[in-house]
Amino acid sequence: MRNVLYPKLAATNIKKNGKTYFPYLLTCILTVMMFYDLLLVSTNSALDTMPGASQLRLILNFAVTITGGFSAIFLFYTNSFLVRQRKKEMGLYQVLGMDKTNLTKMMVWESIYTAGAGILGGILAGIVFGRLIFLVLLKLIRFDVAFQFSVEPEAILISAGLFGAIFLVILIWNIFQVQRVNPVELLQGGKKGEKEPKANWLIAVIGILLLGSGYYIAQTTESPLSAITKFFIAVILVIFGTYALFTAGSVALLKLLKKNKAYYYKTKHFVSVSGLIYRMKQNAVGLANICIMSNIVLVLISATASLYIGQENIMNTRFKTEFSATSDETTPENIQAMERIVQEETQSRGLEIIHEQKYRYVPLSAMKYDNQLKFDTDSGSGYDADAMRGLYVIPLADYNALEGTDISLAPDEVLTYFPDEEFDSGEIVLGKETYHVKENLKESNLQKKKEADVTKNIYLVMADDAAVEHVIQLYGPTKIPITMQYLLNFDMKGNDTAKSEALESMKARMETSGEVQSCYVEYREAYAQEFYGVYSGFFFLGIFVGFLFLMATVLIIYYKQISEGYDDKDRYQIMQKVGMSKKEVKGSIHSQILTVFFVPLLMAILHVTVAFKPITKLLLVFNLSDTHLSMMCTIGVSAVFAVFYVIVFAITSREYYKIVK
């Protein structure tokens, strides 16, 4: 009889607490399903047949890790709401005669039901939707592949093992919570409030300083290279600043509202403000969590959507021309062989070469400070990402041939071209030597003005080959010897099929036939499918992980409203008994929700607005230079999220009102 009691009691408890348990169970099922399907897709052998398979698999494996890690944190966090709501119930069981051993047995069965439903339901849902999810990925990549769908025992075992361990840790924690308190504390657990916190202005000021510092770093980041590190520093500062402002700043704000008699002594404001002050320490952390998670959803989805939608822009940024060949063998014979192959392959197919660039150059890097270019090989020259420039040194003869000019230079004279910034000095210091600037070029076929690139570029035209070699000596020794290279870029006009054939043939002849020495060829068409795979994988990752964080945000809002409702139930009933009408009670509820629950949304949108500049710099690392597209994606995602947030608010506030009335 006793063996049947605990399973029945556990099932009854779950059913009775359906308002809090069923959303949790649904979340468990969806979380397990997402993890299982990501694992299934990432280990599917069909991925190996796709272009960019290694990068795509790396992205998917990263998504699996993120999903697994966040699932543990998320389920543990949401479980705390369930425990808090059930403390009074647990205390009542002890008063009625159940000891802590009996409670433990009941909780074990509740965990078995919860874990069983979550894991089994999630894996079954994953099996049902797994094929659909893989087909969505293929659709995003624009690639057809034979996909053999099968139930993978290994994926099932890994999913069941991971989430089984998560639920076991949650059970142990729940048992510890019940074992360490007495029945009286449990009976008060559901109602237990906190002492009215004082307005901690020090923490509030620290929060403002942290937030301001994060915002300042975000707005002063100029280089995409520095954005990689600075953005994450800014994110950490903003996260800590957000928590500090919500925990201390919110209390300070409510205290100011309380001092504002015109606002505070209105019926609908009086109850909500005083109640929120009383429990703000606990509320503030939950609201900060909602803000941070909302921010993650907005940034993740808008950034990956920008990459996916802007793939054409990415291709144009990465590949300035249809064909590009580079060789570090710059003998006249080798250069002539490259040009001969191009001529033969294009003329035989009736293609016309346009936008041609061909010249020798030395690729270097330097840090620019005013009119000084410091090499990173110089002793004492630390790495400065904001000052870093791509430096291309070109012999005058090649420049004259490219531009059709007849300029002459003395050994200590140079032509300078700064396509990405202004430069008007008459001298330029290169390493330890000073050169006179004969002309600062305003336009050049070397590169278009303000052309998007990860680093800003500088072009220096030197008097002759000897002057170029001298610059290499100034640069100093490197692990890989620096040599002059020959660049051959061009577009073609003609039939698309003929273009494809010519591109493929030129690549094969220059790289593998032996006609040309030490040559590397790349062309847009060859890498298009690989790029689609990588950036579609990012979008797939953004949707999946973004949905996971969105689900967490919704559940936290829901539980926050439910727990607030139970906390306020007695208080509002007392208010109705002393004369407040239902309309006044509802007005007070809306005052509380509008004052507090929309603050996380507004703060998240503010964070995204400030973060937009460094995000566009980071996207440039991925070759996306279309800022307008990024802005439209961010605005669109923010608008959709705001509408979704309002819908969640409407549903949860209705549940809140049902509880308190």
Each language-model region and where it sits:
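Hydrophobic alpha-helical transmembrane segments of multi-pass inner-membrane transport and secretion
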Residues: G18-A46, Q55-K88, S111-A125, I239, ...
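Hydrophobic alpha-helical transmembrane segments
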Residues: Y21-L25, N61, I156-G161, W201-V205, ...
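Basic-flanked hydrophobic alpha-helices used for secretion and membrane insertion
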Residues: I314-S327, E333-M551
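Short helix-loop junctions at transmembrane helix boundaries
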Residues: L40-S54, I123-I156, G212-T229, P600-K661
